[in-house]
Amino acid sequence: AVLLCWLPHLAVSYPASMNSDTQSQFDQILGLLPWSKHHPTLLAFFLLGTTRLGHALGSGNAGLFAYVLAQAVFAAAVIGYSQRIMRRLCAPVWLRALSLALCAFAPVYCDNITVILKDVPYSYAMLLMLCEMVRQRFLEKESEGFSAGFVLRMTLSAFLMLRMRPNGAMVWIPICAALFLGTRGR
């Protein structure tokens, strides 16, 4: 549902939006500027890969749009997962509907989803991590331990958080410590 609401924004912003920081990274990827360690290497590889894909299909713009579309699909999946967690926690319908409407229509979500920026996948990776923390703490039995799905989702969130922003470790490590200490006390 959220992805459908974002389609007009994706169409208007085709192929993508970039701020000046991302533009300089893109220029580095294209060889127009010298390479810098200022930008996340993972984002550079994603941009390079999707741009090459676009060129192979006949349009570099299609490659940039492929990146933005993949980002939007990931974000919509995480938002959908957060709705599922809220439902399992018996959150009131009005709260779930309000949070879904906020994600679908608030300018910050609609605009950010069309921007190539390291903060977008980082933010949704953090939301995924928070959903897993809540699910593990409040919805799972201690005797079940960590499921394969939990490990997969936490690994994905850790990978994106640690590779997209230098401060990802300052968030990830204390939260994991709290998770493991919290499960021991249950």
What spans do the regions from the language model cover?
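Start-transfer (signal-anchor) and selected internal transmembrane alpha helices
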Residues: 1-8
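Extracytoplasmic catalytic/substrate-binding loops of multi-pass membrane glycan-assembly enzymes
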Residues: 12-25, 34-50, 58-62
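Multi-pass, polyprenyl lipid-linked donor-dependent membrane glycosyltransferases
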Residues: 19-23, 66-73, 101-133, 160-171
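Transmembrane-helix motifs of polytopic, lipid-linked glycan transferases
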Residues: 69-90, 128
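Transmembrane-helix signature of polytopic, membrane-embedded enzymes
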Residues: 82-105, 123-124, 143-148
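Membrane-interface transmembrane helices that cradle and orient dolichyl/undecaprenyl
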Residues: 129-150
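Membrane-interface alpha helices of multi-pass inner-membrane proteins
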Residues: 150-165, 176-177
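Perimembrane helix-loop-helix junctions
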Residues: 171-186
